[in-house]
């Protein structure tokens, strides 16, 4: 079997832990039954020995496969990782979702996306990345009694993303330590109103309002202090036809949204101005993970 799982960008400014979308950048994993266990890693993380010795995908896969099938089989895993690691593009969510879905498939069980999403919550307790990695598109989610509830909206085909990827790994756990311990009532209301309005902008295609709807007072400023150049990236993107520009997930990557022609031009301009950063033009994925 082969499974493709997309990269994701979460929060989108004010939608902390609840909003996310899916990008056409995929981790590809092939799994075959084998006489002996083996693992091969290409792409991102291929030079990381730890990923071979203690691979999260493999650990989750075997845990679920053995629970479902009652068997202890050996498999050959071939990973082609295209999602940058620990850069706020959902690399951990892609691993979790991919491992669970693969385990269900190889156990002979029906792969139901709602079930996969609920199981993924066990390993990542916020749905902003795992939901778009599973469903694709723009997704708004909440958790109620250990169950994920998500509403998906396909993303306008005229839009594209420009993702700026610094050479700075930042785990979600590290990034959360930078968050403020307390929040004022006014700032809480600010984020509630902006996250709600941002969601409405995507649903109703009111893209002209995204620039201010995507503002945040909960997490971005504290997280971006780790890499102050991102404030310059954000300002530059918004001055060059980005509809919105926000920290991607917990960082360190930065996500900008624009109409396709503008996005292509913006990617070139950012790469020229910020030469130390990797820049990618990406279209949006509306399917979530796919088993081939």
UniProtKB/Swiss-Prot annotation:
Domain of life: Bacteria
Pathway: Amino-acid biosynthesis; L-threonine biosynthesis; L-threonine from L-aspartate: step 4/5
Compartments where found: Cytoplasm
Catalyzed chemical reaction(s): L-homoserine + ATP = O-phospho-L-homoserine + ADP + H(+)
Record EC number: 2.7.1.39
Xref: Pfam families: GHMP_kinases_C (PF08544), GHMP_kinases_N (PF00288)
Keywords, comma-separated and alphabetical: Amino-acid biosynthesis, ATP-binding, Cytoplasm, Kinase, Nucleotide-binding, Threonine biosynthesis, Transferase
Cited SUPFAM superfamilies: GHMP Kinase, C-terminal domain, Ribosomal protein S5 domain 2-like
GO biological process: threonine biosynthetic process
Record GO terms (molecular function): ATP binding; homoserine kinase activity
Coiled-coil region(s): none
GO cellular component: cytoplasm
Residues bound to ATP: 84-94
Enzyme class per UniProt: transferase
InterPro entries: GHMP_kinase_C_dom, GHMP_kinase_C_sf, GHMP_kinase_N_dom, GHMP_knse_ATP-bd_CS, Homoserine_kinase, Ribosomal_Su5_D2-typ_SF, Ribsml_uS5_D2-typ_fold_subgr
Function: Catalyzes the ATP-dependent phosphorylation of L-homoserine to L-homoserine phosphate.
HAMAP family in the record: Homoser_kinase (MF_00384)
Family per similarity comment: Belongs to the GHMP kinase family. Homoserine kinase subfamily.
The name this protein goes by in its record: Homoserine kinase
Organism (species): Campylobacter jejuni subsp. jejuni serotype O:23/36 (strain 81-176)
